[in-house]
Amino acid sequence: MKLKLVEISSIIRGGANIYVNNKLVATTHNNVTPSFILSLIKSIIGVSAIYGGYFEMPSTATAKLFYKNTPVTSAVLSHTSFTEETISGYEHTRIIFTFSDASRTKYSFDSLQLWTASTHALLSHVSDIALTSPLKKNPQDVVQIDWWIEMESGQPFANILSYLQQQQATYCTSSCTIPSVVPNMVYGYSVFNAFFILLALPNVIQVARDIKTPLTNYLVEGLTLASQVKPQGITSVICYDVCNCQMTTNPQQGTVSEFIGDNYVYVAFNFNNPCPSSEYVVPISTLDLGNGYELQFAVAGVPSNGTGASALLIKIPYGKATLKNLFTHQGE
C-alpha cells in the first residue's frame, strides 16, 4: 500500500538586475540548482547523521562572476533585505541580495553564480545566471547586482489546518474543532519557507528580527536559545481523523531516497504508515537546537491510502523549469 503521490506546490525562483554605474544593463531570471533543492528537502524530511552534523546557516553570500566558464571575480555582499507575505493564499518568502564591485579592474562576464557562505567557507551553490551576451566592466565602473530568490508555497504544504478543515467540511456530516500540535498548522506558514530562510538568508536572526510575521517570530525566538542547529528530518507522523477531531502521534524513523531528473528533484520519505485510509497523514519535522530546545513543523496534510509501506514524495522544479528567457541590453 502506498501513500498518494504528492507533488509539492512549493516553487523556488529568482532573478537579478545588473547595473553598471547605476544604469540597468541586464535583467535575467536565474536557474535554481538541484544541489540547493536537495539540501532544502533533505533537511526537512530526513538527513543522515553526517549531513545533520555539517548543517550550517550562512553568515554572508557572494556572487561569483565568470567569462567563458573561467572565474573572473566575486562581487561583495553589501546589503540583504527580506520579505514574508501571503498573497491569494500562497506564502511568498523573498530574499534580495545586493552585491557590488568597485575595484579598479577591467573584465567581461557572461555568467554568474549565487553562493551562500560562512565566515570561513562557501556553503551552498544556490542558483546560476547565464547572459545572452557578455557584460563589460572598465576600471572606473561600478557593477551592482540585485539578486532575488523566492520560495512560494500553497496547500497542502501551507495552511495545513485550513486544508484539514476544508476536508472536514467536504466529507464529514458534522463539524468539530481539529486540534493542532505545532505553530505552523495554526498560523499557516510552510516548513519549506522556514528552511529556505535557514539555508539562504545570511544572519537570519538580525535580518528577520524586524519582519514581524508568525514564521519569523517562531524562528527568531527559537534560534536565540540555540546552542546548535541540526535538522532531524521527519521524527513522527500524526494521524488525523477530521470527522471526529481525534489524532494519534506515532514516532517515525523512515529512509530517504532521491533522484535528480531533467527538470525536477525528487526526494521520497519511505516509512511504515500507521494511518488508516479514512484519516490524514501529517508528518512532523524537527530541528534540534540543543539544550533540550527544538522547533517542530508540520510538513503537509496528505490523505492516507491505508496502513503499511508508504512513501511521501516531494517534487520541486529546478533548471529549465525555473528559467525564463534571458536578455541583456547593455549600451555603448
Curated annotation (Swiss-Prot):
Keywords, sorted A to Z: Host membrane, Membrane, Transmembrane, Transmembrane helix
Membrane topology, record value: Single-pass membrane protein
Transmembrane regions: 185-205
GO cellular component: host cell membrane; membrane
Protein name: Uncharacterized protein 53
Chief site of localization: host cell
Compartments where located: Host membrane
